[in-house]
Amino acid sequence: MLSQVLPGLVDINTTLGYQGATGAGTGIVLDPNGDVLTNNHVIEGATEITAVSLANSITYPVDVIGFDRANDIAVVRLRGANGLPTAVLGSSSALAVGDPIAAIGNSNGTGGAPSYAPGNVTQLGASVRASDEAGGGARELFDLIRVAAEIRPGDSGGPLVNSAGQVVGVTVAATLNYHMGGVSGREGFAIPIDRAIGIANQIRSGAPSPSVHLGDTAFIGVGIADAPPFGGPPGAVVRQVLPDTPAGMAGLRAGDVITAVDGIPVNAAADLSNIIDQRRPGNTVVLSWIDRVGNPRTAPVVLAKGPVG
């Protein structure tokens, strides 16, 4: 099975320049010219991305084609790639509880020989709350394949394969910045491949939507978190303001609470991310926030080009 699957995979490595960190994950090759399916959280926050093909061991610079944050799907392109083997795709609709599966990936982000975690399907249509430290706040992921298999950080974005070696899911594993609530050490989740490919095809066709973002990411330059449920206004709490960014120039400070963008309410950190996803670098938006002493503030902000997602 491994010999059938491995040539259609890549190891993804990211530099998170604003966080002073690095990350790693896995990708599934969709096209000989280097279109690759992975998780959004694998590339989120990246200022530089490279990928190593398991078919030829070549390291490629990576461009982001687009992403769907709500469904945790992204499509990237390996710059200069051609003639790559592609993954063999199956259908997640044929899966049943008890079916044998295996998760293949870049376990713990170490590169080298790929990891192989056998197991079986334990639930279809599962949901899990994922805490995203890079993007702030938490998100609910729905309609997932739950598996009993030892999936680890670095496996994210890699294939869940059936006994025929066909890709039936995209693994969603905990990473240093992405944590699954209530998940034991020997289980994991995957996005059904039928849904993942539908989103990937939309991204590759250049069709944006309320959930799909194409091209460069707009950026205001803040680290955010959900506001506490009690004791203050709902919104996105500013944890950090990066220097020389639109937010800093507008006067935002750590401890402020962003409450709206262009009059659209921001009730949680994810709301702010979703609104900015639909804007482009160079667009002007009107930010509304409550400052640390409780004063309402409003200012126009020109969005900059920022890290992915």
Predicted regions and their residues:
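C-terminal cap/linker of serine protease catalytic domains
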Residues: 1, 107, 163, 167-228, ...
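A conserved glycine-rich beta-strand in the N-terminal activation segment of trypsin-fold
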Residues: 1, 13-35, 50, 58-61, ...
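PDZ/PDZ-like groove recognition
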Residues: 18, 150, 202-260, 264-275, ...
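Catalytic-histidine neighborhood of serine endopeptidases
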Residues: 32-72, 81-83, 273
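A structural signal for beta-strand boundary/capping segments at domain termini and interdomain linkers
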Residues: 59, 284, 296-298
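Active-site region of chymotrypsin-like
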Residues: 6-8, 79-88, 117-186, 218, ...
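Terminal peptide-recognition signature
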Residues: 10-12, 27, 34, 38, ...
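Active-site substrate-binding loop(s) of clan PA
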Residues: 63-65, 82-112, 116, 191, ...
